[in-house]
Amino acid sequence: QDGIIPTEEELSESWKRLASLYAEFSKICAVSLAYLDPQGNLVCKEYYGENEKAILEALSVTLNNMQAHNSQYRLVGHASKYFDYPYTSKRYIINELQIPNCLDSSNLKPWEGMNLCTNELWKCGGTGAGSSLQALCNVLGVPISKVDLVGDEVGSAYFRKEFARIGRYCSYDSVATFNIFRKFKQEDIFEFDQVQYITAYSEDMVEKEVVEEQPLLQKIYKATNIS
């Protein structure tokens, strides 16, 4: 930048800070979806782990099921118009997976997208960078994440394999975004302890299923030997 060649140390530090912003150099390790069930309860589904492809496949199942029940449903995210939606779509392509219909904008004109972004809504038709999720939570009186983790610390948490912690961090952000959207519509918001958290995918679940299946397989094997 400005004709100055960065040192190896500076490049290393910038890589740690900026690589996660690019779908080409990073991966998804956690996703959360917050939604109201038919009884009006707030449910938050968490998908987390090291296997990105499995996370995206599980996410597709949920998104496609939601669309099957309501073809007009929309996704809502914060600063998602220029990051979360395109980033997630790119990771689907990189993993050679079909993009869920609700994220696929390939056949849409720029003004035809149905998904919403609270950052764009907060601009109220104006221009500018908008506001951070935390700033909006503060000014609107919305509960802020209770996980002692911020965005630029997720990478370190990933390498420590703290996937459940990252998943809950994402869930609290999803709930906060949900509450902000309800504030825009003058509706009541939810406290974090009023939310039903569901682990929709984690590698611990897969490992548990394998462990639980082993005794049954052993019994079948032994029974076969006896006969």
PLM regions and their residue ranges:
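Acidic catalytic cores of enzymes that act on phosphate-bearing nucleotides/polynucleotides
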Residues: 197-198, 203-227
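Metal-dependent phosphoesterase core characteristic of DEDDh/y 3'-5' exonuclease domains
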Residues: 26-41, 67-168, 172-194, 201-211
